[in-house]
Amino acid sequence: MNNSLSPKAIRELREETCNPLGAPQVTTDLSENIIMTSLDDLHNWARLSSLWPLLYGTACCFIEFAALIGSRFDFDRFGLVPRSSPRQADLLIVAGTVTMKMAPALVRLYEQMPEPKYVIAMGACTITGGMFSADSTTAVRGVDKLIPVDLYLPGCPPRPEAIFDAVIKLRKKVANESILERNKSEQTHRYLTVDHEMNLVFSENTGEYLNKKSEKSIESSKLNPVEESSENIYETNSIDEVIK
């Protein structure tokens, strides 16, 4: 009897006796059942969809960012949830003028943020000092002298649409990062420092120009003798008239 059964029948009989429930059926379209990705892509996708900003507003630029909270722009659709604690935030948005007294507080907030963290410099006063960079002794000429900046957003002030564009560009940067490369590029210094090669240069200014006469003094010295001679001639003529 066993010799009359085909190999296929024997296989089916064995499956029925060994596994009465039957083997699970796998569909031919594997793309609907299997997701293939890398750890970097999965990690970046989770982070770019939930950027929690810490809002550091010191001047008028922050008013434009406050407009994003309303229903007209609704920045919640990007996953932005404002936080009041730096330990719960991964994005620092600096908007407004940064003074010398506020610089240590800003650096402390940045240090308390967990890795990975990002910084957006919003407005001209934050990037370069703005109108206070000319004659102010208390304004910081650029927040990148204190903390590393990932994205610069110029404007005085920037519009809410420009802030959305900056967030989208930052999301693209987050999506292309690697965990290993991010660990290599972590900041090791308290402040953002740059190595400079100082060369000794002697000044060409010897101070001789202070002893030189100006062009006005030279011209006045040339004109004075003529005036004196004309006055002498007038005096001699008047004396002659009196004698006559």
UniProtKB/Swiss-Prot annotation:
Stretches the record annotates as Disordered: 213-244
Compositional bias ranges of the Polar residues kind: 231-244
A Pfam family: Oxidored_q6
Coiled-coil segments on the chain, per record: none
Any GO BP: photosynthesis, light reaction
Cofactor(s) it depends on: [4Fe-4S] cluster
List of residues binding [4Fe-4S] cluster: C60, C61, C125, C156
Keywords, alphabetical: 4Fe-4S, Iron, Iron-sulfur, Membrane, Metal-binding, NAD, NADP, Plastoquinone, Quinone, Thylakoid, Translocase, Transport
Reactions listed under catalytic activity: a plastoquinone + NADH + (n+1) H(+)(in) = a plastoquinol + NAD(+) + n H(+)(out); a plastoquinone + NADPH + (n+1) H(+)(in) = a plastoquinol + NADP(+) + n H(+)(out)
SUPFAM superfamilies in the cross-refs: HydA/Nqo6-like
A GO MF label: NADH dehydrogenase (ubiquinone) activity
PROSITE patterns membership: COMPLEX1_20K
Gene Ontology CC: plasma membrane-derived thylakoid membrane; respiratory chain complex I
UniProt superkingdom: Bacteria
E.C. designation(s): 7.1.1.-
Main subcellular localisation: membrane
Listed Gene3D superfamilies: 3.40.50.12280
Function of the protein: NDH-1 shuttles electrons from an unknown electron donor, via FMN and iron-sulfur (Fe-S) centers, to quinones in the respiratory and/or the photosynthetic chain. The immediate electron acceptor for the enzyme in this species is believed to be plastoquinone. Couples the redox reaction to proton translocation, and thus conserves the redox energy in a proton gradient. Cyanobacterial NDH-1 also plays a role in inorganic carbon-concentration.
NCBIfam families: nuoB_fam (TIGR01957), PRK06411.1 (NF005012)
Subunit structure of this chain's protein: NDH-1 can be composed of about 15 different subunits; different subcomplexes with different compositions have been identified which probably have different functions.
HAMAP family for the chain: NDH1_NuoB
Designated name of the protein: NAD(P)H-quinone oxidoreductase subunit K
Organism: Prochlorococcus marinus subsp. pastoris (strain CCMP1986 / NIES-2087 / MED4)
